[in-house]
């Protein structure tokens, strides 16, 4: 019997999305970003499905070690870099690249005793002002890393965009110019483009692109949909109806009696709630897909359940499946109703949701 709720992960969708991104950036290698448990899709699931990617980007060392333990041989890059000097021997032992973005990391590299050098991607703060060395610091930092025996040569170079998901925002062009002027004529790889860069800013594609959300079939741009780019949703979040009830006009439903029926109808109770990662703040009208149609959430989402208005003439039965988002109901649409972004929805599913390859 299939578990409920479950996140069905489509390997063919993941492979399609990688192919689409390769076509978009045909001169670039692809660093598939699989941080946050593969954006909620399962770290090893995604890496195995995307085994033809040229490398994988991760946030934490533990994620990289899990991939190595799972047999992944491709290039791995820690996008936040290492945090402790004791991380450095692990990077060497498991052949893991690291971003360097801060003085403390440079000092640890200079002071370490390592069996071989570490591959470093120096992050430039071209305008996001979160991580990275500033343009004023760049020459000095680059010289220090070049002089450090624990740093493999050449040093690779990267930056990250603040507003690439706003295609009309000129700031991305400013960031590209800043980065390109600083790094002109230096050896090594360059990477600028995230998903939005790969899809909307072709001049940013560089030697490597670093797509994340687009690999999972989701557009990074609010109001857009992955399908507009040939992307296919990789996750179907599925549960089922555990009750179908006749409901009279004037009767409330759920905690706080938040919603009251304006007419006689039939309600369905779906076995998923905020304990599974479905947002408690999903408002009335947020769509759920049941038997080929959108039906609205009514009342408050509770820990284990939510309620939908099936309509007065509904013939839905207990046990029928309900799709919370996926191929028939884009996660971008659900996120817009809730007032969040698709990234948050797919990454916040809890361990109660079974993640399985479909």
UniProtKB/Swiss-Prot annotation:
InterPro entries: Ala_racemase, Ala_racemase/Decarboxylase_C, Ala_racemase_C, Ala_racemase_N, Ala_racemase_pyridoxalP-BS, PLP-binding_barrel
SUPFAM superfamilies the UniProt entry points to: Alanine racemase C-terminal domain-like, PLP-binding barrel
Modification N6-(pyridoxal phosphate)lysine, positions: 35
UniProt keyword list: Isomerase, Pyridoxal phosphate
Pathway note: Amino-acid biosynthesis; D-alanine biosynthesis; D-alanine from L-alanine: step 1/1
Top-level EC class: isomerase
Gene3D superfamilies linked: Alanine racemase (3.20.20.10), Lyase, Ornithine Decarboxylase, Chain A, domain 1 (2.40.37.10)
Binding site for substrate: 130, 303
Protein family (similarity comment): Belongs to the alanine racemase family.
Matches recorded under PANTHER family: ALANINE RACEMASE, ALANINE RACEMASE, BIOSYNTHETIC
Function noted in UniProt: Catalyzes the interconversion of L-alanine and D-alanine. May also act on other amino acids.
Name of this protein: Alanine racemase
Organism listed in the record: Shewanella sp. (strain MR-4)
